[in-house]
Regions:
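Short, small-residue-biased leader/transition segments that mark boundaries at the very start
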Residues: 2-6
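Short, solvent-exposed helix-helix connector turns and helix-capping sites enriched
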Residues: 7-11, 54, 117
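Generic alpha-helix initiation/capping and coil-helix boundary signal
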Residues: 8, 41-44, 208-209, 225
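Membrane-proximal, glycine/serine-rich, low-complexity loop/turn segments characteristic
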Residues: 10, 18-21, 28
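Helix-centric, low-specificity signal for extended rod-like, repetitive segments
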Residues: 16-18, 48, 94, 150
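Short, functional "switch" segments adjacent to catalytic/cofactor/reactive centers
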Residues: 25-87
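Aromatic-lined, polymer-binding surfaces characteristic
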Residues: 79-80, 85-270
């Protein structure tokens, strides 16, 4: 077992055993993914392909349309990824926030599972490694200025990463070293959310709690997974009533938030 090898301080072999475990794990069922008969929409395939060239999908933003397909903004600058990039014509703060939700990564994972082309996982590893090196996980309270680690950003990343990992896990490019990097980063993301809950009872808070609870359910191997599940379950139970007014409308009085909150509860129930 991986834990036995780890105790002997044979860390590479422990990671190797852990990778073997995750590749063969059969007792955890993620209802959000279908690995037996994987499919991908043309929309997601376009996102996956453009991300290979560092044209990253940022929800609700596109540079233009070409041949019936959306073309996304390029984050390339001097042969590197410019994570601070904001197009001059965009003043909406949402672009910056959405960038750090990595919304192109799950489409790349789906593309890999459907097409079995290693370029998708190679792109994911390259880009996510670059992002992790650029934005180390902070400890404690995060300020609003650290948009990469604030609010919805880590919560949406955690939810996606739980789905991304099984799509890529069988690839030869998913090495023991990369598994270690990924899992350490994942645990850091979850703990960052726990240290920075929104306290206003908003839809953001529900997504944070959804991420913690889902991590506890679908990644039970982590030493803190029991705490994630316990904490998340308690908060979700509280929010099922706290989120809604007496007439059943979500407390922020926005139909899109109402739908989002209900969807969050339903996904946990699944």
């Amino acid at each position: 077992a991986a834990s036995d090898v780890y105790k002997r301080q044979e860390y590479y072999y422990a990671a190797h055993e852990l990778l073997k475990y995750y590749r063969n794990r059969a007792d955890i069922n993620n209802p959000n993914i279908n690995l037996i008969n994987p499919t991908i929409t043309a929309f997601d395939q376009n996102i996956a392909d453009q991300a290979l060239e560092h044209r990253f999908y940022v929800r609700n933003f596109k540079e233009k349309e070409e041949n019936g397909k959306e073309v996304y903004y390029s984050f390339d600058k001097d042969k590197k990824i410019d994570w601070t990039y904001v197009p001059t014509e965009i003043t909406d703060q949402e672009f910056k926030s959405q960038t750090h939700r990595h919304q192109w990564m799950l489409p790349q994972a789906k593309a890999y599972r459907v097409n079995q082309n290693e370029k998708y996982i190679q792109s994911w590893i390259e880009v996510y490694s670059d992002w992790l090196n650029t934005f180390p996980c902070p400890e404690g309270t995060v300020s609003k200025d650290a948009v990469q680690w604030y609010g919805l950003q880590p919560a949406e990343r955690v939810l996606d990463q739980i789905d991304i990992m099984p799509h890529f896990i069988q690839s030869t490019n998913f090495t023991p070293q990369w598994l270690s990097t990924f899992l350490v980063a994942f645990a850091g993301e979850v703990e960052c959310i726990r240290n920075n809950y929104y306290t206003d009872g908003s839809n953001i808070y529900v997504t944070q709690v959804q991420a913690i609870t889902t991590a506890g359910i679908l990644m039970p191997e982590f030493k803190n997974a029991e705490a994630w599940l316990s904490e998340g379950s308690q908060k979700i139970t509280e929010q099922i009533t706290a989120q809604f007014l007496e007439d059943g409308v979500q407390n922020e009085l926005d139909p899109s938030y109402h739908i989002g909150v209900v969807a969050g509860f339903y996904n946990i129930y699944k």
